[in-house]
């Protein structure tokens, strides 16, 4: 074991012992004398921890989580703060059934229930109901989320198909990042985190209200070095965000927001045979009007990039991937325009009807596609929530989506919720979803030049160039899902138990195939996959100062897919955590994650070139070993005071360690070796 590993292990052990000692001391020592307002604030926060969450992701309107017709999990702002994470995928690891794959210092893939892969494209991600999923390429830039971490109020995670509500791309599920209102974030919040690998996570947020007008302004800067080369920059971004809202009446409001994320270094994305270097800039503008149960939203998002397409390190001397002009650095420019309209109404005493429509226009310009491309989408949806009896609710929804590139699709969802006694709910559901081909998959136009050494003086090498093409004949990917589950409250709402079983049938996945003459083209794989399994977990509040969670997820995959569209996922995953927080300002969290060994498909390019002795290529193994991830955080809130405006001012310092055991591991055969990282944090709100 190296000195670095010894130091990291010793530091991790010391942090655990320190947290346990602090638990004993803080539990034993008498509480400090504090004013009544602080006591009231702590009491109110405790009561909130006992309450059932209200979510809006499942039905597009707010409802108790136990009444949601889909499987929903909530991550709070406290979960984010106490995690010590510098990015959201690290926080999302606690959600049972989600799969997180870190490829590099900048590149993450997030999916659910067996759907993860490089360039994962089957999870719809939104911020305040506005999609940040890049339709034109099927991409989510997880390190370039357009809000800072302190602005996030909660994250709602829906596992399973949700096209009945959200249309295309809600394939594996939906993640909605909900931000704090100007009233909730009133004042100025400054946060700075810095640590190993040149890591910086910083944010400055100012929010307030003036009469009926509210505003929130934020800036942020994030950066980190590469895992494989700790002296090389892996990611750096600057972000700006502004949200304003005006209360037109007690039941209506107008909201206008906009922002920009400029990423000047993004180590990734890692593809089947590439390890790219991209520099995406993401901008948006959003207008929302809400009047009671009626909502209309219009937004625009823009995407520009200059991406350098680089072959995998083993292939860099053998392959060259360029646009049709022979350039390996390619410009991209994409735009999305979207309008959503929805209305909910109560019919009689037992029905709640939701209906609405979505129109979207996408365009993409790049030298890597055959021409400037555009598409139009129109979706119409309706859902009825029928309270058939006091203990029985039936939810049925249907959506029809039109698309200029493919035939129309119908996406149904039916859910039955049975509550035999208060606090205990059983649910049974079935749904279907689609992911259409992206503009890039339909119109790709690139070239691959292969240089094969001969091993003789003349000719020293043989060159060949073949096209990589998209196809306008692609059908949408499809998933049909069935789920049964239970959630119940025990111990006076201090313990929640959840358990779910699922079965997914996946077909028509889009992948690249080598055709005659060595050319490559996107096609729909003729195979299919049946993915089934279950998840179980508990969340508990043991006392005012101790809470925790524990989850287990299991899945099996039977499939006839071939090539790189084959599904790969760990059979077993475990997540667990303990959190302590005391009146004297001390807090801490220990979270543990186990991910089982996994086999992922490797591109045929590697295996083909490995058979030619002169190339020196060794095909990567398709298996990644299991790994254990232990994350730690200890914090101390040394100042707290109630402001004249009614909110709490405070200041906190903290130390966090990612992968405290330094279990170096890969999460994909082509990914980097992930190590440990220690951070120091300062957060002030005034």
Residue ranges and their predicted role:
Residues 354, 387-391, 498-506, 524-604, ...:
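Gram-negative outer-membrane beta-barrel transporters
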